[in-house]
């Protein structure tokens, strides 16, 4: 499992590194587009967005809730990490998906990078133990959702632009859709956990298990680095052979988890 975790982590970082030139270019272009918005026909119906004040207000409310809710023990520091990583990765994700497609969205790499940074930062600031682990996984999970939804919204808005839709109405629809689906998905995940439990033979949850192992290992300084490095080198060899690293690594981790549950 630790070999698989090392391979998944390396695969995520490799995909992120390979995407860096496009990430930097798209981030710069996106920022340029924001600041030049006043010059490109703001009054046109097909260029009408939600009021930026409303967007910032909703964002502020969400950040305060995330920082204050006891079930998400991340505090102000965790909220700041989410704002920084979320802003950058949402911009990158939406732009890359809009230009190339969802297959080019390195969500796994972004999630793993956030998870590692968040765990190290929380540990360095004294937030350790179960609280630190839950906080780090919460931050990584939120950023994963941010990157995925940003890419999805980008595809929707791009399609809307092609057919002449109004962005503001689409954005309102996106908000309604996200809230409704979050409630439904949360309820389903709760039922699955109550029925079978994650990490069992029925629901191995390989990626979640890998995230747990990495966070626990960093927090407790108990990572078996020899096995992790074996996984890293396997990922590098697989990349050199031209095989997609992340699908290979996740499949390996899932297989090992399944074998362990059978034994």
Role assignments for model-derived ranges:
Residues 26-43, 202-209:
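Juxtamembrane inter-helical linkers in multi-pass membrane proteins
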Residues 253-263:
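Conserved small/polar residues in nucleotide/adenosyl-binding loops
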């Amino acid at each position: 499992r630790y070999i698989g975790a090392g391979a998944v982590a390396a695969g995520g970082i490799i995909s992120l590194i390979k995407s860096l030139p496009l990430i930097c270019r798209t981030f710069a272009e996106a920022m340029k587009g924001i600041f030049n918005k006043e010059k490109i026909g703001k009054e046109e119906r097909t260029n009408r967005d939600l009021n930026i004040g409303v967007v910032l207000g909703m964002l502020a409310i969400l950040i305060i809730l995330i920082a204050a809710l006891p079930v998400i023990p991340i505090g102000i520091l965790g909220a700041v990490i989410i704002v920084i990583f979320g802003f950058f990765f949402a911009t990158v994700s939406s732009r890359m998906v809009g230009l190339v497609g969802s297959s080019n969205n390195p969500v796994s790499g972004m999630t793993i990078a956030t998870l590692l940074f968040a765990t190290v930062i929380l540990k360095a600031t004294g937030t350790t133990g179960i609280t630190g682990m839950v906080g780090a996984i919460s931050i990584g999970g939120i950023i994963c959702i941010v990157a995925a939804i940003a890419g999805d919204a980008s595809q929707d808005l791009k399609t809307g632009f092609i057919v002449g839709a109004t962005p503001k109405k689409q954005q309102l629809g996106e908000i309604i859709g996200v809230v409704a689906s979050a409630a439904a998905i949360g309820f389903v995940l709760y039922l699955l956990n109550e029925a079978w439990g994650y990490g069992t033979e029925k629901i191995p949850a390989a990626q979640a298990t890998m995230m747990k192992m990495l966070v626990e290992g960093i927090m407790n300084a108990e990572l078996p680095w020899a096995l992790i490095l074996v996984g890293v080198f396997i990922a590098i060899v697989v990349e050199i052979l031209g095989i997609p690293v992340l699908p290979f690594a996740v499949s390996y981790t899932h297989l090992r988890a399944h074998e362990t549950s059978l034994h």
